Design a protein with these regions (language model features):
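Short histidine-centered catalytic/ligand-binding loop motif
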Residues: 16-27, 76-83
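N-terminal, Lys/Arg- and Ser/Thr-rich interaction peptides
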Residues: 1-24
């Protein structure tokens, strides 16, 4: 089973750390993205999710018509800082979907450093919002990426994988 690559609209950007000289960004997908891709690819009636171990684990199962049985993949999540139980369930679901291959290209993202001139920093904090402008994926690997600082309304990161 092959899931489509993530589009720029599927990917969210968050600030991982801030220094006086700039900030580091991370790319991620949310649970709604996974649900949408599962619905698109296998149909809304052909997949299911189950949580166990107090939401720490999630099992994502897809119906295999040829085998006439559910095929399952499972993973464990971690609590979020805001809503522990909901965050745990969401994280375990997203991780189980990574096991199916949804969004696995995010593991190949480059290091994203935004220098201080492209982000508003005050006391080693920023409230700037960022988004993926464009992404290019080849063979499940990110080969091109551009990021916009939505607050400043400008492109702040542009990267293309070097040809070998």
């Amino acid at each position: 089973m092959q899931f489509r690559d993530l589009s720029a609209d599927d990917i969210e950007v968050r600030v991982q750390s801030v220094k006086d000289t700039g900030c580091v960004l991370l790319l991620y997908k949310n649970a709604r993205c996974d649900m949408n891709i599962l619905d698109e690819t296998v149909g809304c009636m052909n997949w299911k999710r189950e949580h166990c171990r107090d939401n720490a684990n999630c099992i994502v199962s897809i119906w295999d018509e040829k085998k006439e049985q559910w095929i399952s993949k499972e993973d464990t999540g971690t609590e979020s800082n805001t809503e522990a139980e909901k965050g745990l369930a969401s994280d375990s679901f997203k991780r189980a979907c990574f096991n199916w291959g949804i969004g696995r290209e995010l593991y190949t993202a480059p290091f994203i450093w935004i220098p201080a001139g492209n982000v508003q920093i005050n006391n080693k904090k920023t409230f700037d919002k960022f988004s993926v402008e464009k992404i290019k994926v080849e063979n499940k690997r990110i080969t091109g990426l551009s990021i916009i600082n939505e607050t400043l309304k400008k492109r702040v990161f542009l990267w293309m994988k070097e040809e070998k």
